[in-house]
Amino acid sequence: RTLIFVHGAGFDHTIWVMPARYFARHGWRVVAVDLPAHGRSQGAALTSIEQLADWLARLIDTVSPNQRASVVGHSMGSLVAMSAAARYAGKVEKLALLGTSAPMPVADVLLNAAKDNDQAAIDMTNTWSHSVGGSLGSSENPGLSNLAVGERLLQQAGPGVFYADLTACNNFKADALELIEQPTLVLIGDEDRMTPARAGLAVVDALHNVQQRRLPGCGHSMLSEQ
């Protein structure tokens, strides 16, 4: 069994350290990817969710050539997972969507700041991504600050990468949802300010074979908060 984790805009594979470790210890072949131009992956940033889904499909051919893979995606990664499931049903077995919304509009003030590689884009994203408790710096991991970790990860993205990601999210159309037949789990943070709970519930309503789980008191950065 192969399980592929896909990160969100501006981030990389390191956000999946704990869940990847868990599933690896429970018999899964785990791949936490760095999308092109993120983390350790080279190349230019891809500018649409469809291009990223094509890239993911090629990755599945490489790591699981004879068997469909399950895909877990957070935020932008959830859009990549949905697009891949809709367009490459023969490659994707199941989905888990965290902090999702379809479409996924991005505020102009954030897009413009990211286009200018302005620190303000990181500050806005970092603040809006956390619940009230999370934005105060609290963490379930002793000695860590959610805000500091999130800021550092976004600062590591190369020039133009965060803007390319946000543009891809902003341009994504929800048409793909009606084509998804794979079993899907949607995780919704009740205090998510980036992809509000109502947006996650709209995705649930649009899918055919779906379960949902609500995370009380959790913001968009659910991987660090819970």
Where are these regions (language model features)?
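Active-site glycine-rich loops that stabilize anionic/oxyanionic intermediates
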Residues: 8-11, 75
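Conserved alpha/beta-hydrolase "acid-adjacent" motif
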Residues: 193-199
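Catalytic histidine-centered segment of alpha/beta-hydrolase-like enzymes
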Residues: 218-226
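Conserved alpha/beta-hydrolase catalytic His-Asp/Glu region
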Residues: 112-179
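Active-site loop/oxyanion-hole signature of alpha/beta-hydrolase fold enzymes
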Residues: 17-25, 29-76
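Short beta-strand element of the alpha/beta-hydrolase
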Residues: 1-8
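Flexible "cap/lid" loop of the alpha/beta hydrolase fold
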Residues: 79-124
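Short beta-strand/loop motif that positions the catalytic acidic residue
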Residues: 180, 186-188, 192
